């Protein structure tokens, strides 16, 4: 109710983003002013400082290897969130289907709040994954999947509660309904993701100065997709992997480059979105984070509201 009122009463305000475009070897890259302009006059004054004769100096180029960790195995809430995001299944529907798969002995107990398995269960995982990679959904990924060096991030007996994380049992799925097949694929696919290598990326940050103003560009290129190759979803993209085409040109520190183009884009602030089932489940898990009183926030930090 509070989020709905906040969204309904939100008053949008304009702001402006200034960018320049540089070109090298037939490819370009956009650089953005690090601060948004809240004042139109200030934004237009900054824009007018740049001309077609402007030249920028590249003053910083930083490359580093970064890793995106494989996700943990599913507990019930995480499964419900992903089924809602990717397949528009409600939390109740996902639970009902997961329970049906459990009763058919295809998956472990679904009403679990843990995303980990103990070492004795891990001993059976290679054999289970060997069956998973023969399934039609994962056959292509399975051709290069290495069963000898599994990621053990989801293995921790101290974080297992009454029941361990959701995994498949190795029983061959037959005669599943369309919805059952979807949820089974999610659970089996998450097993593959969880035990796959990290996603390796090369991060590139560049900074330049144009007419006395700082501009920055940040991007990342996937070197080895690791776990992200299981489903190859765009939703797995991180903030350093922009959706738009910011360009691929790379410059050297100290280079002086003429400005190819520049622009000033007007945008507007947006309210926090209304809850979906997936985001509501996240809010239930993290119910203490938005409590203003620090002592009260710490008191409920690890509680959550419970498993749906």
Name each model feature, range by range.
Residues 88-103, 293, 302-308:
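Short amphipathic alpha-helical interaction segments
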Residues 1-63, 160-225:
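Phosphate-backbone binding and catalysis cores of DNA-processing enzymes
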Residues 58-62, 69-83, 108-112, 271-286, ...:
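Short acidic, hydrophobic short linear motifs in intrinsically disordered regions
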Residues 18, 32, 38-41, 97, ...:
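Extended, highly charged linker/hinge segments and catalytic-adjacent loops that couple domains
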Residues 65-73, 87, 91, 115-119, ...:
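Conserved phosphate/pyrophosphate-binding and hydrolysis machinery centered on Walker-type P-loop NTPases
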């Amino acid at each position: 109710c509070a989020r709905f009122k906040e969204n309904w009463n939100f008053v949008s305000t304009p702001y402006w983003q200034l960018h320049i475009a540089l070109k090298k070897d037939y490819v370009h890259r956009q650089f953005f002013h690090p601060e948004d302009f809240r004042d139109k006059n200030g934004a237009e004054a900054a824009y007018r400082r740049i001309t077609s004769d402007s030249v920028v100096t590249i003053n910083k180029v930083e490359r580093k290897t970064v890793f995106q960790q494989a996700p943990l195995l599913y507990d019930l809430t995480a499964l419900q969130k992903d089924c809602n995001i990717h397949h528009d299944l409600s939390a109740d529907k996902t639970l009902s289907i997961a329970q049906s798969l459990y009763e058919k002995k295809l998956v472990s107990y679904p009403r679990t709040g843990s995303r980990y398995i103990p070492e004795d269960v891990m001993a059976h995982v290679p054999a289970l994954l060997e069956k998973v990679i023969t399934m039609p959904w994962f056959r292509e990924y399975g051709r290069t999947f290495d069963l000898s060096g599994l990621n053990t991030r989801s293995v921790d007996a101290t974080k297992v509660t009454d029941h361990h994380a959701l995994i498949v049992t190795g029983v061959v799925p037959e005669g599943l309904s369309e919805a059952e097949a979807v949820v089974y694929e999610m659970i089996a696919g998450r097993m593959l993701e969880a035990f796959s290598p990290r996603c390796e990326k090369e991060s590139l940050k560049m900074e330049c100065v144009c007419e006395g103003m700082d501009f920055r560009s940040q991007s990342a290129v996937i070197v080895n997709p690791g776990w992200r190759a299981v489903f190859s979803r765009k939703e797995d993209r991180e903030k350093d992997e922009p959706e738009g085409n910011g360009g691929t040109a790379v410059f050297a520190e100290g280079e002086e480059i003429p400005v190819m183009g520049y622009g000033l884009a007007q945008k507007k602030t947006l309210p926090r979105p209304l809850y979906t089932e997936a985001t509501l489940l996240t809010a239930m898990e993290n119910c203490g984070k938005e409590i203003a009183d620090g002592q009260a926030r710490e008191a409920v930090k690890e509680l959550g509201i419970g498993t749906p």
